[in-house]
Design a protein with these regions (language model features):
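Condensing-enzyme catalytic core mediating Claisen C-C bond formation in acyl metabolism
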Residues: 143-220, 228-229, 343-344
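Phosphate/pyrophosphate-binding loops at sites that engage ATP/ADP/AMP, CoA/4′-phosphopantetheine
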Residues: 1-14, 176-180, 213-229, 251-255
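A glycine- and small-aliphatic-rich helix-loop capping segment at beta-alpha/alpha-beta transitions
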Residues: 28-45, 107-109, 129-142, 204-205, ...
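Conserved small-residue
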Residues: 1, 19, 76, 96, ...
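Active-site nucleophile and cofactor-binding loops and adjacent substrate-binding regions
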Residues: 12-14, 63-70, 87-95, 263-275, ...
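Conserved beta-ketoacyl condensing-enzyme motif
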Residues: 1-80, 84-90, 120-129, 224-240
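Acyl-CoA/ACP chain-elongation machinery
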Residues: 111-157, 190-204, 232-241, 258-308
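Active-site-proximal alpha-helical scaffold in enzymes
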Residues: 1-7, 69-80, 86-121, 160-181, ...
């Protein structure tokens, strides 16, 4: 809020201010539920009456409400008196990028003057870690945690879970000008597709990712020569990194080898629903500062991942437009194109 110049309020009519948030499951009280479960076991069965009684005696009255995934957006609306559109996006790893894309559309069509948009997720708990382990999605380099996340490297074996939240302020241009806002960039294009394949795997030929990138380029009115940097989804899993590289090559053809690509998940881990919004902010800083973030732990090239992944060290380079990809479990694909704002 401070960076957006909104510390003293949002300078927008409450009914013209909205929230669009990408998130996962809501607040989960695993410890209380586990204690209740253990105390309710009789022989090999769960005594439902005992479980219910213990719940009524020990759980917070808002337990059911707070575990709903739309609660973060609801809390933000109350905090900022945002009486405009209030929406929540539940598309796994693509959620916060999709929230930003859809919030942009709300502003474009005049439904709001200001949208607070981004994502939040907290998955570092027993259920989250166990679940991703069952999917064999996590790295097993427990003896080398700092080197475990290695997108596009030949020896990658899964991602490292991260946690966090990231938000941006999306604002109608004349509204932003009127209050003298500092504009960090603009959303030029937005693409959203589905693989319609397996919920745990991206399509092996990059069908959805390819069409998503093309859709974002078309929405922005840009061609393959107009992108200066790609902030990849880059999860450090065997399939994702290969397929994303393939999709980039299908869209950009020979120019794919000249566009710097990196995955900041190599440094931050995978924030799941919050990943895309975090990477949007990284992309905007790359545009502002002319510094492209690296892919760390890139040591052994993979023949199927043969692009310029900005290995191991940031690179100074002029940057006008960025493609940021987010691909989620379930087959959701989101591509955003961000650009430097040129005030005519």
């Amino acid at each position: 809020m401070r960076l957006a110049g909104l510390e003293q309020g949002l300078a927008a009519a409450p009914d013209r201010l909205g929230i669009y948030l990408g998130s996962g499951e809501g607040q989960q009280d695993f410890e209380s539920f586990t204690r209740m479960m253990m105390a309710s076991i009789e022989g090999e069965s769960l005594n439902v009456a005992t479980f219910t009684r213990l719940g009524l005696e020990t759980l917070h009255p808002l337990t059911e409400v707070e575990q709903e995934p739309n609660m973060p957006a609801g809390h933000l609306a109350a905090l900022f008196d945002a009486q405009g559109p209030n929406l929540n996006c539940l598309t796994a790893c693509a959620a916060s990028s999709q929230a930003i894309g859809e919030a942009t559309e709300l502003v474009r069509r005049g439904d709001a003057d200001v949208m607070l948009s981004g994502g939040t997720h907290s998955m570092i708990h027993p259920f989250g870690v166990t679940g991703f382990n069952l999917l064999t999605a996590l790295s097993t380099r427990n003896d080398e945690p700092a080197r475990a996340s290695r997108p596009f490297d030949n020896d990658r074996d899964g991602f490292v879970l991260g946690e966090g939240a990231a938000m941006v302020v999306l604002e109608e241009l004349e509204h932003a000008r009127a209050r003298g806002a500092t504009i960090y960039g603009e959303v030029l294009g937005y693409g959203s597709t589905a693989d319609a394949f397996r919920i745990t795997d991206t399509h092996p030929e990059g069908r959805g990712a390819t069409s998503c990138i093309k859709m974002a380029l078309d929405d922005a009115g840009l061609g393959r020569d107009d992108i200066d940097y790609i902030n990849a989804h880059g999860t450090s899993t065997s399939v994702n990194d290969r397929v994303e590289s393939l999709a980039i090559k299908k869209v950009f053809e020979e120019r794919a080898y000249k566009i710097p690509v990196s995955s900041t998940k190599s440094m931050m881990g995978h924030l799941i629903a919050a990943a895309g919004a975090t990477e949007v902010i990284v992309s905007l800083l790359a545009i502002r500062d002319g510094v492209l973030p690296p892919t760390i732990n890139y040591e052994t090239p993979d023949p199927d991942c043969d692009l310029d992944y900005i290995p191991n060290a940031a690179r100074e380079a002029p940057c006008q437009r960025v493609l940021s990809n987010s691909f989620g479990f379930g087959g959701q694909n989101i591509s955003l194109i961000l650009g430097r704002f040129a005030d005519a």
